[in-house]
Amino acid sequence: MLLNIRFILKMLGAMFILETFFMLLAAAVAFFYREGDEWVLLLSAGILALAGVLCYGIGFRANEYNVGKREGMLIVTLTWTLFSFFGMLPFYLGGYIDNVTDAFFETMSGFTTTGSTILNDVEALPKGILFWRSLTHWQGGMGMIVFTVALMPIFGGGATLLYDAEASSITHERFRPRVTQIAKRLWGVYVFLTLLVAFLLYLGPMDLFDAVNHAMSTIATGGFSTKNASVGYWDSPYIEYVIATFMCVGATNMTLIYFCFQGQFKKLFRDEETRWFYAIVLVAVLTTAAYLYMKGIEMDVEKAFRMAYFQVSSIISSSGFCTANYISWGPFFWCLALLLMFVCGCAGSTSGGLKVGRIMILAKNLFNVFKKQTHPCAVIPVRVNGHVVSNEVVHKVLAFTFVYLSLLLFSCLVLTLDGAGFEEAIGAVFASLGNVGVGLGSIGAVGNFSELSDFSKWYLSFLMMTGRLEIFTVLTILLPSFWKQ
């Protein structure tokens, strides 16, 4: 069957038009502060609006019945790619980032909530551009498709296809019958949490602008800051505890948080993946705090705990905020950081990585394999939350993990061939595919990605999008069979 190009253009046009309003919001902030960036944001919004009207006009009479999974996957992949292209215009046209490669990398990092940056002096940017930079995080956190499905009824029956293609986690199937309804509710929770974090940060030493920007980055588990020293700029225990806590909230399954808003707290506490996630956080924090104290890196017990809590929360939630140069903590924490980058948060959250849910299924399946060594005739299914996980799901998890690991190893080879150092290559690949944002070596806590080659930046941009869309959506499009009739 031929691809329904008109439908694809119609959907892209609708999303471009909606995205225009977000860019106009950044322009409004720019007009408020009057730092010279207002017109470039208006111009960029105009270009985006024109592209949206053209695409929507061409696809206006699209046949919505002739739509399948191929259209869904292509729309989602094109959305993230083209949003990054149009989203980079304020950076590039305004001269704040002087080449296309860096501008695209920065914007893709924003929309995918990776948080990697090529900027050496973030504080030199005007406030409208800084707000747009944080806003890319906030949109990408819950998923741009999910947001558009929530607000625009034109998607109709195509909503489920798009939702499946973008939110391809292992736990979202329960909501398929009411995709539009659920998308609206999830975004309601998302907005409330963002406002709550902004309010709490404003109660501390942050001004309103910084509080709003960091609230968007925190709930989206993104990591973009308005300061060169990231959250460490304020040197405030209160700020660090608030952000660390809500980074973990952002890494929790958002649907379970929604149930909490309905008063169904038991669903959160009884969920195995959530318990595994917070158990991992607890063990990692206590281990790191003990390590920092015993090694003499930090002799104050409370500060050792706070540093460990913040940095572990930042990495496992795939946020990438920093309050300390963890590279100076030694190889032990580097290895722990890589493990946390690999695992990351829960399915259905704003975080990246392999997800705790998959790790849990892999661990239970491995345990069953050992059991069958002594009881070969036993039928021992994998169970999650008391329910049997089908063999199909287990096989998908195994396949996903294999592809994820293969892509990690292959990508490390690619970057080292391009001249990156060993530590930098490993750190950059883990940070990009897991959407974590911070790596090792010169691209660690106090470094950035500016020294990498243009090829490496384009390749890492591809990894960011691939990781954000959970690999299969993007890689399937690269298969020749995808394009066959």
For each feature predicted by the language model, list its residue ranges.
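Membrane-proximal intracellular helices of multi-pass ion channels
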Residues: 1-485
